[in-house]
Amino acid sequence: LGAKTIVFEHNVDALMAYQEFLYDHSFTSLIKCYFIKFNEKFSVKYATALIALNKRDCDGFERLYGRRPEMILPITSPKVDLSLVLGLSVVNKPFLLFVGANFYPNIEGAIWFIEHIAPYISLDLRIVGACCENPTLAYKTIPSNVKLDGYVNDLSSYYKSAVAVVAPIFKGSGMKTKVIEAMSYGKSIIGTDEAFQGIECDFSRIGAKCNTAEEFIKAIESLSDNLFNPYTYQVFSDKYETSTVENR
């Protein structure tokens, strides 16, 4: 029909599907791999313009389908008026925050943190989101300093009250929405290489980039009591705040 189309790819979905198959080795995941790659191939082929979230995804599309996206447009988030956000009144102990949907990289990351980090730190870990309903996590024996809060009415109060946000994510594609969201609240963030994909900053100032249990524990032990990280908030305002990107 000659219609022009713009495809904004938030992941290299074929790679995500393959990672899921490696995670659960199910026949369903294997079938999904083939169908997703088939559909993605034609989406990339026939799009008038292709947009990706970061350089890694551009490389992935070029490697799989022979086409490099014409534009990189990162995930953004609206500016938060922090003066209007109330802290958690029912929590009086310092805590780390993990936020995640019921998605296998989140489940894998949360369980890894519970097993390898939580028993060796003094801070509580509060896990928020649909990931808490996943049976693998919901029925797991957890240390006393881990709280599965599940769905919450006001996520902003958790962000404001947390000492830091942790993102122990080891698989994925695209960018991590919850990391950008945490930045919009000016939080210190301790995450993996995967968690920080597409984010340009001094990771030692935003929190820490960690990929081993030892690195996570060391970074957590080095956290200050300051609940607001001005450097994180400045990076967000300069690079990932929605209106800033729209006005470029």
Q: Which stretches of residues belong to each language-model region?
A:
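Short alpha-helical segment that forms part of, or immediately flanks, the ligand-binding pocket
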Residues: 156, 177-184, 198-199
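Conserved catalytic-core segment of nucleotide-activated headgroup transferases in glycan assembly
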Residues: 72-144, 148-160, 210
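Conserved acidic donor-binding segment of nucleotide-sugar-dependent glycosyltransferases
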Residues: 204-214, 220-227
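Short acidic alpha-helix that forms the nucleotide-activated donor recognition element
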Residues: 41-45, 153-163, 184
